[in-house]
């Protein structure tokens, strides 16, 4: 059994995941009635979601209680990159929507859903999540609360004994080991997720609402393959594409099928460790990115809102488009704190144009129809950019120190 496991782990993870994708797609088309296969995907996603809050909590405490002051500069750089990238996503979505205007067929109202009524409500939700009970935050995977309490505990424990710090560090290492075991079975999880998608939706979702999907996905691909390389080059001053493709293979592919930035946090941390990045930095920036680095969500909110405006014949001038970009970026940063994510923040952006809640809910309904593709690509972009920008900021510091950048 041990020999079989060693042979399995000897094959590179991307190759194993690719094999799982192919087998899952074939099984989904050949035997779609074998619904039991999809449980592999559910087990994988739930295992990652289960371990991620504990991993983040103890890694952040371990990192901060032993951290040196020099790490603050890197973290500030990463946060600036996150916020700029999210705003850039909204701007690109505005340009794409202007070049390829979309209208929607809104035949019937979507099911009534509770959505935020204004930016104040989004900010209030974020602030309340910060001070939520730490045990509740871990149980509910409230990463804003987890980060806030972990930072407080980590700073408070800087004066603790070396033995206490060692115990915390050992516990964090044990959690990281468990994550490694889970990730080794990612191909089976991806197999189940792909099977579920293909057997349930087939290829139909790629043909309906094709123009809308093309603008959404096209904008996200433009961000990943055009603007991201520019940002990375600014940081590392060398060819950015090896790092771009590494993050694509190791982070985006998994996030595409799990459709969960939270579930992808352990995977991103694993890749950071492989690249030799500073754990004191990435243990903070990766979970933080899952909350505020939301360029994919900004694209979705902007494109869907402008599609609603076009459908109703509402003209959108340049100043309004700029305001929409900022509003979408701010809303996107709150997407992780709202059940339903970016789609349920569409009414907030629609309010800028005086679009009624009924119409906004119909737009959300369209979003749920294309969600199997839109949400997958959005999550892949969001989560892989957490890894990409965290690495780029770290490599920027290495470049300044004259260290060789290898990944």
What are these model-predicted stretches?
Residues 50-62:
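Active-site-adjacent helical/loop segments in soluble small-molecule enzymes
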Residues 39, 75-79, 107-111, 239-256, ...:
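The feature identifies polytopic integral membrane transport proteins across all domains of life
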Residues 13, 48-52, 140-144, 179-184, ...:
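Membrane-interfacial loop-to-helix junctions in multi-pass transporters
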Residues 250-332, 389, 400-407:
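Helix-loop-helix junctions within the multi-pass membrane cores of secondary transporters/permeases
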Residues 303-407:
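Transmembrane alpha-helical segments and their short flanking loops
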Residues 8-10, 14, 18-30, 42-48, ...:
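Signature of multi-pass transmembrane helix bundles
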Residues 64-73, 159-163, 200-201, 237-240, ...:
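Juxtamembrane helix-boundary/capping and inter-helix hinge elements in multi-pass membrane proteins
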Residues 47, 83-91, 217-221, 255-260, ...:
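Hydrophobic transmembrane alpha-helical segments of multi-pass transport and channel proteins
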């Amino acid at each position: 059994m041990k020999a079989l496991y060693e042979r399995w782990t000897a094959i590179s993870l991307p190759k194993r995941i690719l094999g799982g994708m192919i087998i899952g797609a074939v099984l989904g088309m050949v035997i779609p009635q074998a619904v039991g296969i999809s449980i592999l995907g559910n087990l994988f996603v739930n295992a990652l979601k289960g371990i991620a809050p504990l991993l983040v909590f103890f890694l952040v405490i371990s990192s901060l209680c032993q951290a040196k002051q020099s790490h603050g500069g890197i973290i500030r750089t990463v946060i600036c990159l996150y916020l700029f990238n999210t705003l850039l996503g909204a701007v690109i979505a505005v340009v794409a929507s202007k070049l390829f205007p979309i209208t929607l067929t809104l035949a019937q109202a979507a099911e009534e859903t509770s959505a935020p009524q204004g930016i104040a409500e989004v900010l209030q939700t974020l602030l309340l999540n910060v001070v939520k009970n730490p045990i509740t935050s871990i149980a509910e995977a409230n990463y804003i609360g987890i980060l806030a309490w972990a930072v407080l505990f980590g700073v408070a424990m800087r004066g603790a004994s070396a033995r206490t710090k060692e115990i915390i560090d050992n516990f964090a290492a044990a959690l990281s080991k468990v994550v490694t075991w889970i990730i080794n079975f990612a191909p089976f999880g991806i197999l189940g997720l792909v099977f579920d998608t293909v057997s349930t939706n087939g290829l139909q979702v790629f043909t309906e609402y094709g123009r809308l999907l093309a603008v959404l996905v096209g904008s996200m691909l433009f961000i990943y393959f055009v603007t991201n390389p520019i940002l990375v080059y600014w940081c590392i001053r060398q060819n950015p594409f090896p790092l771009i493709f590494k993050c694509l293979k190791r982070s985006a592919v998994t996030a595409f099928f799990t459709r969960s930035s939270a579930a992808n946090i352990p995977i991103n941390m694993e890749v950071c460790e492989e690249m030799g990045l500073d754990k004191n930095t990435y243990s903070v920036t990766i979970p933080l990115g899952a909350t505020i680095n939301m360029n994919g969500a900004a694209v979705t909110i902007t494109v869907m809102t402008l599609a609603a405006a076009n459908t109703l014949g509402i003209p959108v001038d340049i100043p309004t488009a700029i305001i929409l970009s900022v509003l979408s970026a701010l809303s996107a940063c709150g997407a992780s704190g709202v059940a339903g994510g970016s789609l349920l923040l569409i009414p907030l952006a629609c309010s800028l144009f005086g679009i009624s809640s009924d119409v906004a809910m119909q737009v959300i309904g369209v979003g749920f129809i294309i969600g199997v593709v839109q949400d997958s690509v959005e999550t892949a972009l969001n989560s892989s950019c957490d890894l990409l920008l965290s690495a780029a900021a770290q490599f920027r510091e290495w470049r300044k120190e004259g260290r060789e950048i290898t990944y």
